[in-house]
Swiss-Prot record:
Catalytic reaction annotation: cytidine(1402) in 16S rRNA + S-adenosyl-L-methionine = N(4)-methylcytidine(1402) in 16S rRNA + S-adenosyl-L-homocysteine + H(+)
Enzyme class (EC, first level): transferase
GO cellular component, one term: cytoplasm
Protein name as annotated: Ribosomal RNA small subunit methyltransferase H
Protein's job: Specifically methylates the N4 position of cytidine in position 1402 (C1402) of 16S rRNA.
Organism: Chlorobium chlorochromatii (strain CaD3)
EC number(s) recorded for this UniProt protein: 2.1.1.199
Transmembrane helix in keyword set: no
Length: 328
């Protein structure tokens, strides 16, 4: 089996292509993964006769993902550049590449597919899933210093409760945090996902469905905290807005309410026009917003796609276009 066969099918690929590929230029896949969305973008550019004057830049902090993407996109090498880095640094990474190659750094489209990949979930050694026994790791960048084990074994009860509540929206955050601290004091440090999952199972009543919901919230919270996912998301959205040229588009796919809330607020905030001081009636705004929202409501996967790829069930795709800078 080829490396890329173990990676996920691209979620909402047709919708991404239809909303993002409008013309030739520089396209940035800020969450390259195994390269499945990048491949769909390259194929669309080729089909529309836009490939020869286009470049796709893929960014990922996961070395395994970069290796898989390089294999998948090998035939497209003249039109691709693959970079290792956190997408929060996307603006500087892309600018450095453009400077090195003597390119004008005006980006036509940016894609962000948020969250953990199927490959990462399915690889026990990465420690992302409660369904597989592995080390408590959860790092997107496996060279980063902070692991889930460091967090779960050294954070105090108040900090753990905060993480479980704010990043997992876990209603029993305090009780779970207290139980974690009590167990590590009695039995020593947690080392595996299985040990943490076993504790949650003992504390959760209401059957397997309730257990799975609690485990999902807890593991999500730890993953977000380990990788500072929400902080990185705020930064990459600002970076994407900076990179885009006039009419360039930003497509963001989220998988849980915390991510989607950040994206929705960012789009709404930057789409607002300046109507001047309150109490002054104007027929037209003083200036337009930086963005125009393309998808008034998020695009969702069809029933057919969800049947083929259950990961698509929770996906929400939001797209916005950068306005040409001008004063109205």
């Amino acid at each position: 089996m080829a490396l890329h066969d173990t990676y996920h099918d691209p979620v909402l690929a047709a919708e991404v292509v239809a909303t993002l590929v409008q013309r030739s230029g520089i396209y940035v896949d800020g969450t390259l993964g195994g390269g499945s969305h990048s491949l769909a973008l390259l194929q669309a550019l080729q089909a529309q006769g836009l490939l020869e004057s286009s470049l796709l830049i893929g960014i990922d902090q996961d070395s395994d993902a970069l290796a898989m993407a390089a294999e998948r996109l090998q035939a497209w090498q003249p039109y691709t550049r693959l970079l290792k880095g956190n997408f929060r640094d996307m603006a500087s990474l892309v600018q450095q590449l453009c400077d090195a190659e003597g390119r004008a750094c005006a980006v036509t489209g940016v894609l962000l597919d948020l969250g953990v990949s199927s490959f990462q979930l399915d690889t026990a050694e990465r420690g992302f899933s409660y369904m597989r026994s592995g080390p408590l790791d959860m790092r997107m960048d496996n060279t980063a210093p902070l692991t889930a084990a460091e967090l779960i074994n050294h954070a105090d009860e108040a900090e753990l409760a905060r993480i479980f509540y704010h990043y997992g929206e876990e209603p029993r955050s305090r009780a779970l945090a207290r139980a974690v601290v009590q167990q590590r004091e009695k039995m020593g440090n947690f080392t595996t996902t299985e040990e943490l999952a076993a504790l949650v199972r003992r504390l959760t009543h209401g059957g397997e469905k309730a257990v799975i919901k609690t485990l999902s919230r807890l593991f999500q919270a730890l993953r977000i905290a380990v990788n500072d996912e929400l902080g990185a998301l705020h930064e990459v959205l600002e970076g994407a807005l900076e990179l885009l040229d006039g009419n360039g588009r930003l497509a963001v796919m989220s998988y849980h309410s915390l991510e989607d809330r950040v994206v929705k607020h960012f789009f709404t905030h930057h789409a607002q026009c300046d109507w001047g001081p309150k109490g002054v009636a104007l027929r037209e705004p003083l200036s337009q917003g930086a963005l125009t929202i393309v998808t008034k409501r998020p695009m969702l996967a069809s029933a057919d796609e969800i049947e083929r790829n259950p990961r698509a069930r929770s996906a929400k795709l939001r797209v916005a276009a950068k306005n040409q800078p001008k004063t109205i």
